Amino acid sequence: MSRIISIGTAVPQYKSNQSDILEFMCKAYDNEIASRKLKILFHSSGIETRHSAVPDFGKSGTGKKFFADENQPNIEKRMFKYSETAVGIAVDAIKDSFKKINSSVESFGITHLITVTCTALYAPGIDIEIMEKLNLPHDTERNSVNFMGCNAAFPALKIADKITKAEKNAKVLVVCVELCTLHFQPKYDTDNLLSNTIFGDGAAAAIMVSDEQAEHLNLKGLSINRFYSALLKNGKNLMGWNVKPINFEMVLNAKVPAFIGDHIREFISTCEEKLNIKAESIGKWAVHPG
């Protein structure tokens, strides 16, 4: 089996209370009906604070505001802002993952890098920029999982799992970074209101090795047993992520939780059969659409 021996995280510098973000949103929308809907969504979100790569959303932010002009930043400006800030946050998450195992990028010897993002598209991409920032060897093998949205970390971990099973000495670094708040736009549809309520910016990194390598390094962690995924075709229109002239636009239908509830038993039953497990043997399930 493969093993996740460390997980690191990082967030951008601008931290805002949800109440301050709500105030910003209501001013940006400047519409009584939208403000009323936002207040209901914000108060039921369960979120207290969010981080952003831009200072606009909270009272503590200083410097030039990204959304200061009446005209929304176009897609080019949003991509440029991502290119300025995303890699630094990703590198911070990577360094945090190594710090937790009392190691460093330089001494550990990463052989493979897998990057994950859906909030920007450009090439050469963040994979090469991260290699340069970390001074990784030029022959480090690279893979990128792009534009797969909320579930993208799982395909990335699956790739890492296959690598460590095929190459017992492989040391795989997986890093995900998303700057969702760059795509803020005050549109009145429910999908947009909901996405403006819950998403923030940040990065996470995981170091994966084979069990044999982990034992050799005397490191514990989370062992990965198996993977299983299935596509629920009837739900493909409930979530989406589309490139528009102004921003990347989210499709996030309020029916998603009910749709999952209607199909989760069937999914788990198939999972039991495919993986030869019993649902009751799993202490806790984490269910996430994507």
Regions found by a protein language model. Give the residues of each.
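Phosphate/pyrophosphate-binding loops at sites that engage ATP/ADP/AMP, CoA/4′-phosphopantetheine
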Residues: A93-I110, E266-G283
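Localized chelating/binding microdomains
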Residues: S2, P12, S45, D92-D96, ...
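A structural motif shared across PLP-dependent enzymes of the aminotransferase-like
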Residues: D56-G61, A120-D127, G290
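Condensing-enzyme catalytic core mediating Claisen C-C bond formation in acyl metabolism
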Residues: M1-K81, C180, P186-D262, E266-T270
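Short, surface-exposed acidic
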Residues: Y29-K39, R50, S104-F108, H138-T140, ...
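Glycine-rich phosphate-binding loops at beta-strand->alpha-helix junctions
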Residues: L113-Y122, I282-G290
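Acyl-thioester C-C bond-transforming condensing/cleaving domain
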Residues: D30, F80, E84, A93-G109, ...
